[in-house]
Amino acid sequence: PKEPINGLLSKRYARARIKEINYEMNDINVKPGNPYKFQVGVKNPFLDYLKDWGEEKKRHNPNDGNQDFSSLEKEFNVGTTTIQAADKDGWVVSITPSGGWIPTVIAGKTGVGLSQRAQSFVLYDDENPYNVIEPGKRPRATLTPALALKDGRPFISFAVQGGDTQDQNLLQFFLNMVEFNMNVQEASEAANINSYQMYSSFGTHSKEAGRIVVRKDLPKWVIKDLKSKGYNVVPRDLT
């Protein structure tokens, strides 16, 4: 299906979604929005899927050969990096190479790894109708190399690794700079919060509604408040 790009980018749609945010408690039943309402002449063909969204179906076969992959999971997590570069002529690039380098197939002696991003596809329409595996199609990716412009000129080139946390960490980094007047170093070192509320892009595409990872040196009152709002808070050394 064709994505409702105009609806997704609509300011009216953004304002409608903001009104649905519960500022007092974690909403484990949060669902995707309906951008089709904000795109003229197009109806949403997936309303039935929205009604049942969040009801995970046990379709994974524990006997799948995929289970042998578990011994390599730690190495798999080192599969993404990022590069930001600019030259004297004003050209700026933001690149985030990825593809699950380990484990993967290397093309002969070239050192070129063949991407295994096809794991990010889903098999069933009700999981994500836009991301069902098909010939000639690329999967939904987590990669988000970014370039922010100010007055039509490059202002910040930025990106990060981290799977489904990439969009979250990049937004927090950007807001730290433009809203809270941090410099690049301060924004990079500031503590982030990562949510696992939505379906994962990897593995069995499961979700952990309410689970958030925070940096363990956050003020205790912040962690206490998050727990009081129904979150499962997981402190870590870095976020």
Q: Across the structure, where does each feature detected by a protein language model lie?
A:
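Internal maturation/activation junctions in enzymes
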Residues: 1-98, 107-110, 237
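Proteins synthesized as precursors that undergo proteolytic processing into mature forms
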Residues: 1, 67-238
